[in-house]
Amino acid sequence: MPIKYQLKESNGPVFVLIHGMGSASNAWKPLLPELENYGSILLLDLPGHGGNPLDPEIKMDPASMANAIANLINQLDLPPVHLIGNSLGGWIALELAAAKPDLISSVTGLAPAGLWLTPFLHRIPGTDLSKRMAKASSGIAPTALKSLAARRLGFSRISPHWEEMDYQTLLDAVTAMSESDGYYPAWDATLNRRFDSMISDRIPTTIVFGDSDFVLPSRTCQERSLAPTHAKWIVLEKVGHAPMWDEPSKVVKIINETVSLVK
């Protein structure tokens, strides 16, 4: 099984949390204290992320990752689940809902990738700066992240709240990025692709972006015409590329509102 997972069982529905490229399942920590009150949590680590070994034979494109997660859901014999994905994880969630509608109850995409009219044909020079910085600074990160200068350098493009962000969240993010052998394979697997699949209107779908997302900016990477026609589109103020960090309570509320639309 290419997907590493941790299932936290409770009463209520099952929420499946899918992280982004170069991230890991611990990116969801700020969300969990509230979300755990509403159901079971299935935390995933994609290949080459979060300590999950990278198998070079595994296809890393979003549709293939969606299929791998579908196999896991079937293996665990879960009822229809509620998908929550960030960035690449949001794209994977959308693909999964489109391909396996019987397994999915709802989708909440947090700054999902793939919503661009013109697919990227190659890696854009400089856009892997966060990866290179994390790799170079991993040894000094525990100390460096206590300084505002290091926080600004590493996270000002990710969150407008970089000054007040929890230290452990920042350290987890740097560690995950520096150790993510799947970062470049996942990136390359998105080239010449975009999300253009159809999701049944039976599956409530919400797309959430922050107004301060500089990773997937609105001008090029937030094309509403590619989202399901029935999807609710929300823009949160003073929120960056990781809404679950900047506004965890609002995100949980949005998730529950999406879940409540299931018929």
Feature locations, PLM:
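Alpha/beta-hydrolase fold catalytic core
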Residues: M1-L17, E36-S40, N67-P80, T229, ...
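Active-site loop/oxyanion-hole signature of alpha/beta-hydrolase fold enzymes
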Residues: I3, K29-P30, L42-L88, F120, ...
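Short glycine-enriched nucleophile-adjacent loop
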Residues: G90-P101, V107
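Conserved alpha/beta-hydrolase catalytic His-Asp/Glu region
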Residues: P142-I199
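Conserved serine/cysteine hydrolase catalytic core
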Residues: E179-L226
